[in-house]
Amino acid sequence: MVGRNSAIAAGVCGALFIGYCIYFDRKRRSDPNFKNRLRERRKKQKLAKERAGLSKLPDLKDAEAVQKFFLEEIQLGEELLAQGEYEKGVDHLTNAIAVCGQPQQLLQVLQQTLPPPVFQMLLTKLPTISQRIVSAQSLAEDDVE
């Protein structure tokens, strides 16, 4: 008796779930603005993610904060590369290079220690990260004025 009631309850729940899936899919397909709203939502999430990355940048006028940020980014980048997460590791290394006082020397060291494909990935990401840091710094200066 109990097993039969459980089976009926499971069947009803399964039917309700499938019905909801069909309803949602039909609603999604018939909405002409669904794709536009989805694109806008993804764009907002991407912008929020970029802003979150910029918000953790130190004040470039504070040498101690820059040094701490530099060391943290180098350490985190090395750890992520060791774990095989090359994209994230390269992102952190490019952040460190962008705030480094002597980026050419750091690039030479990284060229000797990193595998060539990872170093090429680093070189391709470096201009965009540097540009974001420059724009973030100019935004911070605009906020002060």
Swiss-Prot record:
Any Gene Ontology biological process: protein import into mitochondrial matrix
Give the sites of the cross-link named Glycyl lysine isopeptide (Lys-Gly) (interchain with G-Cter in ubiquitin): K35, K56, K61, K68
Q: Which gene encodes it?
A: TOMM20
Which SUPFAM superfamilies does the record cross-reference, listed alphabetically?
Mitochondrial import receptor subunit Tom20
> Could you name the domain of life of the organism this protein comes from?
Eukaryota
User: Family assignment?
Assistant: Belongs to the Tom20 family.
State how it assembles: Forms part of the preprotein translocase complex of the outer mitochondrial membrane (TOM complex) which consists of at least 7 different proteins (TOMM5, TOMM6, TOMM7, TOMM20, TOMM22, TOMM40 and TOMM70). Interacts with TOM22. Interacts with APEX1. Interacts with TBC1D21. Upon mitochondrial depolarization, interacts with PINK1; the interaction is required for PINK1-TOM-TIM23 supercomplex formation which is critical for PINK1 stabilization at the outer mitochondrial membrane, kinase activation and downstream mitophagy.
Summary of the function given for this chain in its UniProt record: Central component of the receptor complex responsible for the recognition and translocation of cytosolically synthesized mitochondrial preproteins. Together with TOM22 functions as the transit peptide receptor at the surface of the mitochondrion outer membrane and facilitates the movement of preproteins into the TOM40 translocation pore. Required for the translocation across the mitochondrial outer membrane of cytochrome P450 monooxygenases.
Disulfide bond found in the keyword field? no
Read off the Pfam families from this record: MAS20
Residue intervals annotated with topology Cytoplasmic: 25-145
Enumerate the InterPro entries for this protein: MAS20 (IPR002056), MAS20_rcpt_metazoan (IPR022422), Tom20_dom_sf (IPR023392)
User: Its topology with respect to the membrane?
Assistant: Single-pass membrane protein
Task: Fetch the Gene3D superfamilies from UniProt.
Answer: Mitochondrial outer membrane translocase complex, subunit Tom20 domain
Q: Which residues lie on this side of the membrane: Mitochondrial intermembrane?
A: 1-6
Q: What's an example of a GO molecular-function annotation for this chain? A: mitochondrion targeting sequence binding
Q: Which GO terms describe its cellular component?
A: cell periphery; migrasome; mitochondria-associated endoplasmic reticulum membrane contact site; mitochondrial outer membrane; mitochondrial outer membrane translocase complex; mitochondrion; sperm midpiece; TOM complex
From the Swiss-Prot or TrEMBL record, state where the protein is found. Answer: Mitochondrion outer membrane
Which residue ranges run through the membrane?
A: 7-24
Organism, as annotated: Homo sapiens
List the keywords (alphabetical).
Isopeptide bond, Membrane, Mitochondrion, Mitochondrion outer membrane, Phosphoprotein, Protein transport, Transmembrane, Transmembrane helix, Transport, Ubl conjugation
Q: Write down what this protein is called.
A: Mitochondrial import receptor subunit TOM20 homolog
Question: Where Phosphoserine occurs, residue numbers?
Answer: S135, S138
The post-translation modification note in this UniProt entry reads: Ubiquitinated by PRKN during mitophagy, leading to its degradation and enhancement of mitophagy. Deubiquitinated by USP30.
